């Protein structure tokens, strides 16, 4: 039973990491590969309760717009979390 439970947890973890295609990069990481991408827009999130929720929302929005990469440009925590990001598609 423990083996089945471990396999199920592993499968769920793999499924969760592959739900979204867009990759969140830091500005420093993106600067190394910037020439391979073109900017396709900006996205934002607001009124999220946790940083994990804000990150998930930004990645989901980037994926919906066909982005391959998103780079955070701002974030605030005035009782709730707000954030913005630039989104890029591979050339």
From Swiss-Prot:
Keywords, ordered alphabetically: Periplasm, Signal
Signal peptide: 1-21
Pfam family of the protein (one): YdgH_BhsA-like
SUPFAM superfamilies assigned: YdgH-like
Gene Ontology terms: cellular component: periplasmic space
Subcellular location: Periplasm
An individual GO BP term: response to radiation
Keyword Magnesium included in the entry's annotation: no
Protein family: Belongs to the BhsA/McbA family.
NCBIfam families: PRK09929.1
Protein name, per record: Uncharacterized protein YahO
Gene symbol of the encoding locus: yahO
């Amino acid at each position: 039973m423990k083996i089945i439970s471990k396999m199920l947890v592993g499968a769920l973890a793999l499924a969760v990491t592959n739900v979204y295609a867009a990759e969140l990069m830091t500005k420093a990481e993106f600067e190394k590969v910037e020439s391979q991408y073109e900017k396709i827009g900006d996205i934002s999130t607001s009124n999220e309760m946790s940083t994990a929720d804000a990150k998930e929302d930004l990645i989901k929005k980037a994926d919906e717009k066909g982005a391959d990469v998103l780079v955070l440009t701002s974030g605030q925590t005035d009782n709730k979390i707000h954030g913005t990001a630039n989104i890029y598609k591979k050339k």
